[in-house]
């Protein structure tokens, strides 16, 4: 089976870009696509952070950026890495421009009707980006969802996916030597969901991560006994607090997010 890293970079919520990617990927069999989702990209500093991740997981870049300078910067950086870039809406926009006899207006997210739902998604994405990896725990009560789990259990990409569906999502790494803030155990509004995974898969994912960063592949971070202890510690915490748990071992980001959303909806209807 072929494996492809696909980086989706958008200056808006990225919903249009994601739908295009899904439709295109569905045309191919026996391909494992690892999607990296980057919404609300509107500055060079944000692009700097993204390109660091692209370097670590090189692959195809599919984008919708209407800012000319940002777009040129992305394309230039991709060429330096010898990576292909595809502007998802260019062909359609160019055809419409020729037919209508007018230039398209370069405005980020112009394809969206600026209604309450759209603004809610934007707000959710901004909240989620600002509350990644345990940051901003003082504001957790404002969240809809808190994802907890050991390192490399897909907390961040799942959070971003949920944010694109309008859920303010924070996430917190569970580390035995560094207990989470006590606020995590006293939340009223958010639903806290534990993410776990199989030992073998987690060790492999972590080892691949170290290799992509050119770091020593044999450390306690990938030691079987150490990782097993981390998973057990996290599971005990989830059980002690009555938090629902989702095993992400064989789930895509979309499937994990769908399971989280169902938990939220079930609680709301209870």
From Swiss-Prot:
Using the UniProt record, name the top-level EC class of this enzyme in a single word.
transferase
**InterPro entries, per database record:** Kinase-pyrophosphorylase, PPDK_reg
This one is known as Putative pyruvate, phosphate dikinase regulatory protein
Catalytic activity of the protein:
N(tele)-phospho-L-histidyl/L-threonyl-[pyruvate, phosphate dikinase] + ADP = N(tele)-phospho-L-histidyl/O-phospho-L-threonyl-[pyruvate, phosphate dikinase] + AMP + H(+); N(tele)-phospho-L-histidyl/O-phospho-L-threonyl-[pyruvate, phosphate dikinase] + phosphate + H(+) = N(tele)-phospho-L-histidyl/L-threonyl-[pyruvate, phosphate dikinase] + diphosphate
UniProt xrefs under NCBIfam families = PRK05339.1 (NF003742)
Which GO molecular function annotations are given, in alphabetical order? ADP binding; ATP binding; phosphotransferase activity, phosphate group as acceptor; protein serine/threonine kinase activity
Has the keyword Cell inner membrane been applied to this entry?
Answer: no
Q: Which UniProt keywords apply?
A: Kinase, Nucleotide-binding, Serine/threonine-protein kinase, Transferase
| Annotated organism of origin | Sphingopyxis alaskensis (strain DSM 13593 / LMG 18877 / RB2256)
Catalytic activity, EC: 2.7.11.32, 2.7.4.27
